[in-house]
């Protein structure tokens, strides 16, 4: 069993600045900066590929919209999917971002809306923009889950496995690291390889939905749910195994499979490349 080192959530402090401060910089905030920086770097690499129809200025605007969608959608998604009981008690709860609470599924919806607006403004096909974005989230998801691990949150079920972490005297699955590996590293490697050459329109976005949903659903079997969602069963929605994460991920799998089927049936050329998909 591995002892959990109990990290300080605050990475460092700056200041004070007169009567203000000091400014406390949290590890989770640093992970968000790492995620956005990685997305910018990877998007630039994609834009420089031979035959790409994307320019650096397109990437900068694209990432601005993506960042807004991630933050706003992630917070609102958490409130709607996981925090309605808190909102009922406190009407200002959605604005209390310092209390924590971000949802991947909410962030995904927010990003889709933001990128759709970007596509309309730039007169690009919405599916092409989604396809361009498909390989980018993996690095950010990995950074975010490492941030969860540093914060000591989102632990999994009790375990006596040698790779478990001893937390408050109890062995626990480090499901944050499982997700960092599957939703982060594995997702990124698969999508980066798949998008190395032109693919049919909608195929990269479809594959992203499939891989993420399978990875998330797998980890949900070891991850503890939010107990306040159904206190009678410890947070499980059905029985003692079906979670909110599964409920939100299964539709992603179905939509992703449908997009892949349609993509290879239609074989429309992607507007992201001037080459013809293989």
Describe the role of every protein-language-model region.
Residues 1-278:
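A feature for loop-to-transmembrane-helix boundaries and adjacent hydrophobic helices
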